[in-house]
A protein has these predicted regions:
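Short glycine/threonine-rich loop-to-helix capping motif typified by GTGT followed
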Residues: 155-161, 192-208
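Conserved glycine-rich SAM-binding loop
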Residues: 188
């Protein structure tokens, strides 16, 4: 099964959000304010994922209060912080691990978020190094992983590479005792800026077909 989550940072006009909600689309948030906008627009909290770097304590607290689907954690330190704030609230919070898959998205390095030298996400090796600490945290429940490899991706084989890497990561985490319920995959399909008239809308169908064929989880 799959579900599309709209990146609310693109446009959070209430009228647009009402239309999106009617089609059963979920919401991907990058800030506490975006979580609030989604809640106020009437989205089911369990259709909201909170990703994004630099989350502030008060933003995390709000997401915890709203019982959203998951908070995507960017670092070992953020996992620990979410656990601490969840304990303060007397809750067990669902999280997803943002894993850095070390994949070259064949895009501008400034918008590349998935290679080893990127500041985004947690390397698989770092997860293994901290596995005992992660498992000892009592107020988080790891239910998913989050992969985002970059923006303006024009070479479709990159998405196949991403799926293959995700399959290995999920298999390994499952062997370590984690129950991975979902995989949140991201990476912006590129716009043909050179000849936009030849491709006014990106080839989403091909990307979805690749993910359906190669992603072996769920």
């Amino acid at each position: 099964d799959y579900k599309i989550h709209y990146a609310i940072k693109a446009n959070y006009d209430t009228r647009l959000l009402q239309i999106i909600r009617k089609y059963g689309v979920g919401i991907d948030c990058a800030s506490g304010n975006e979580v609030r906008c989604a809640i106020e627009a009437g989205f089911d909290p369990k259709s909201i994922v909170y990703a994004g770097v630099g989350k502030r304590d008060k933003e995390i607290r709000y997401a915890i209060e709203q019982n959203i689907l998951a908070i995507n954690c960017e670092s070992i330190e953020e996992i620990d912080l979410v656990n601490e704030l969840a304990a303060e609230a007397g809750k067990v919070v669902n999280i997803a691990l943002r894993v850095n898959p070390d994949i070259d998205p064949k895009t501008n390095h400034c918008i590349d978020t998935g290679q080893a030298d990127s500041k985004f996400g947690i390397s698989y090796e770092e997860i293994i190094e901290n596995i005992d600490t992660i498992k000892s945290l009592e107020n988080i429940n790891i239910i998913g992983i989050h992969i985002h490899i970059g923006s303006q991706i024009r070479e479709l084989h990159v998405f196949e590479n991403m799926c293959n890497k995700v399959n290995v990561i999920v298999e390994n985490l499952t062997k370590l005792g984690f129950e991975i319920e979902f995989v949140d995959v991201g990476g912006g399909l590129g716009i043909n800026y050179d000849m936009p008239e030849n491709e006014p809308i990106p080839n989403f169908a091909s990307v979805f077909a690749i993910i359906k064929q190669h992603l072996k989880v769920g």
